[in-house]
Structure formats: structure tokens, C-alpha cells
């Protein structure tokens, strides 16, 4: 079957004119030759590494630029979006006037006009009923490569019938000279228009803006249909039992969901509808700082031809120095999901989840390694999205820095966080799923909970052993803590026992509880949030 491609007239409909050439849904072979052309310079240029993957630099933007994110406020979005300038919660959904949007669109279309363009049509979402058909337009070969890796690649038959629901125009080379007069944050912009179904990118070359941009849009569209939209990894066992893992960076989400006994559904973004859990993506976007073949063989072995490395140091002989974080600690690789062997095939979807795991790395040494959550506690801890890391101070003292990120992904939420919590709990109740809070952080010994014990805890959750054991109630946080689990050091299960003096735990617990309560105050501007206060710590 022939693929129809895209005509200059269609591009003109978006405001892009006089295009020299359209390279439609290029093959990996063509992208490889395009992005490694010797004539390319700066951020456009790709370097071949000895692993077979191409490496690129994203310039000064080595991560997302949340302060430059905007959504057009109009009749469609006015009463649905969780706006940065309304309510108690702080978020990145800054409103944009239609007039400013029109100006930004003019900048991007002018940048893309008269050029040789790459157009990639792809799906966001593995379920045909709810997926977004997205058209990406860019003048940069490796950006086309990035979205080909990260999104779901349609068949020729699907491309022949492809009518996009959403357009992403990446004008990374253009900036906004009028930003100050328009009251914007900088000359760079990542702007969305839900009425026009379009994303505009200017000034930033970071590939993740396209990935997370579409995640933000799924986070708007799906919950309004009663479908859970989740920043999580997911896997499935031999008996078809599905588990989802929520957690912020550094909590062990990727490590713990990569399990030789279970097949990976996906590593980052999922939906949960009437049929079950499904991946939004067709690829993985893994951190590579300090990556080694011994510690993370799956990711290391996925870095081969067709993978795309970002901001890594490549030595003159083509060797990649994964330990070098001089450009950024956020070095990354994108690759198609089929670079991982132990995955769900042919479509990244499975049945309903029966286990929902919230991962936190508590550096305060307060939370138990595992606790069973009630439905109300599930919503409370989902909305809290807590983790903490140890940050060194000038005097060498390490003190915990707490992070609270709603739904373990506040940066990507487009609706009020309570809407995601309500949809998740409804899905869990319909499936009879249970939720657990797993602390991969520290305890009273001053040491981090061992990966051996954490894996034992995850096994006990997945095989049901945790439901068969007695529990005690941990005061202040009111959490149900198991008294014994197979393969797990019993002495660590009650965090109070890891302190020489239990009053030390109590003092730290009260401090952390106050932080939880203060953070949760921002959700009390809705009846749903106010009702959940009693599921939190008791002071």
C-alpha cells in the first residue's frame, strides 16, 4: 500500500509556505545519513559513536523549560485548565492571550517556510480509541529521529488513512523578540492551543519538549473522558497481573519496574481505560549519567543503531564517557521500545492493574519501607507526590530537601490534581486494585534501605504475601505497616526500631508531618481536596 505523504497545500493550511522539500516519515537509514552530514553545524549536527548510536547536543537547553510554557486561555480552556494564576497551587500552566499566540505562530511558520522540512506522523497512545494522531514538523533531522523513537510508529496502512488530531511545529531556531512587551518569561516559548490542537516550540532544542508536550495534552484530554493518565512505569507478570510504579526521579521507578520475571509495558507514561493499562509511547527516554553495562544492562544494550544520545561526552575515538556530566547531569538516550527484549508485544498494553506502587525516597528517615494504603490514603499520597533527597551543605552536613510533586508529575498536569486522583481511585476500585507506599530511602541507621530488601518488598506486593501478614499502625502518619515479609529484614519494617532512641523518630516524624500538611493546603481549594485532609498525618 502506498503512503500518501503530505502536500505543500496541507502545510500552507498551517501557515508554512514555499517549502523546498518535504521528507515524510523518513526511515531510520535516511535519518542517520541526514543527521550525520558533515556540512551540519552546532545543535543540528550528529556524531556517530562507537555504540552505533548518534549523539547530539541540545545547546543551552539540556532539560525542559517549564518557565516558558504557556496555554492559550479561551472558551475551551478557561474553566478546565489548572491555571498558574488561580487557586492555591503553583504550576506551569501560564495563560497566553490569543493575540500573542497568533504572533508566536507567525514566528514559527516564518522560520519553517522556504525550508526543507521533516514531517513525522505518529500516534500518542497504544489504544486506537483514545490515541492522538500527531503530526510533527521540524527542519532538524535529529528532532524527527527523536519523535520517531519516542512515539508509536504507524503501519503503512495506518499512514494511508492518517488525519492528524494535533500538530507540533518545532521552530527551535527562532526566538520571540517581543517577549518583554508581551509579559512573557523569555524569548523562548513552548505554547499550546487546545482549540487549534497545536503546539509551538521556539528557542529551545530540547527533544523532551515534544515528548512531554504531548503527555500534557493527554493529561488534559483523557481524564475528562474518565480515563486515568499517569506518569508511571508499568509491567505485567506471567499470569497477566499488571503493576504500575509511580515515583519521582531517583526513587527507583525504572530499576524496580525492570524485572526479568515480568514484561515491560512502558517506562514513563500510561493510560488506564475500560480495557486496562496502555503505554502512550513507542520508545524509552532513559537517563544515562554514570550508566554502566553491569548495573543497567537493558538500557546499555539498547544504545545501538537507531538510538539517539543527548548531551553526552563523545571522545575522539567515538567512545561515550557516561560518567561525564560536564554538559548536564540530565544526559539522555531515546530508543524504540523494541530495543528492550523483555517487553509486551505486539502492542504495549495489558489488562487492569491490581497493584499500584508509590515510590518515595525519604531522606528524613521517617516513612516505613512499605505500608498498605486505604483508598483515601491512596489519593492523599498520590496528590502529595513526596520524595526527598540529601543535599550537601557548605560545612559537609547533609540535610534532607523535600519535594512534593502532585500525582508524581506536577509539571505535566493540565487539570486540577484532584481530578487525576479521583479517576485513578475509580479505576482501582473497579479493578479491585490495592495501593502501597514504598520507601526506597533512608532510616534511622543513616543508611539507605538496601536494594535487596526493596526488591523483596516489591516481590511480596506482587505475589500477594503482603496481604497475608499482620500489620501495626504507625502513629502520626497512621500507616498500616507489615510486621514480617519473606526475604526482608524484619528489623527495618517499623522505622522506629532503626533508631537507638525512638523519640528521635517521633521528632523527625512530626517535622515531616508538618511539611505534608503545609503542602496539602493547596488542594483544599476544592471540596475533594478538603475531604482528604483527614487521610494525612495526625498532629
From Swiss-Prot:
GO terms for biological process: gluconeogenesis. Its cofactor is Mn(2+). Binds 1 Mn(2+) ion per subunit. PANTHER family: PHOSPHOENOLPYRUVATE CARBOXYKINASE (ATP), PHOSPHOENOLPYRUVATE CARBOXYKINASE ATP. It catalyses: oxaloacetate + ATP = phosphoenolpyruvate + ADP + CO2. Pathway: Carbohydrate biosynthesis; gluconeogenesis. The keyword Calcium does not apply. Disulfide bonds: none annotated. The keyword Metal-binding applies. Its main location: cytoplasm. Monomer. Its EC number is 4.1.1.49. Keywords: ATP-binding, Cytoplasm, Decarboxylase, Gluconeogenesis, Lyase, Manganese, Metal-binding, Nucleotide-binding. Mn(2+) binds at residues 212, 231, 268. This is Phosphoenolpyruvate carboxykinase (ATP). GO terms for cellular component: cytosol. Belongs to the phosphoenolpyruvate carboxykinase (ATP) family. It is an enzyme of class 4 (lyase). Transmembrane segments: none annotated. PROSITE patterns: PEPCK_ATP. Involved in the gluconeogenesis. Catalyzes the conversion of oxaloacetate (OAA) to phosphoenolpyruvate (PEP) through direct phosphoryl transfer between the nucleoside triphosphate and OAA. GO terms for molecular function: ATP binding; metal ion binding; phosphoenolpyruvate carboxykinase (ATP) activity. ATP binds at residues 212, 231, 247-255, 296, 332, 448-449, 454. It comes from Photorhabdus laumondii subsp. laumondii (strain DSM 15139 / CIP 105565 / TT01) (Photorhabdus luminescens subsp. laumondii).
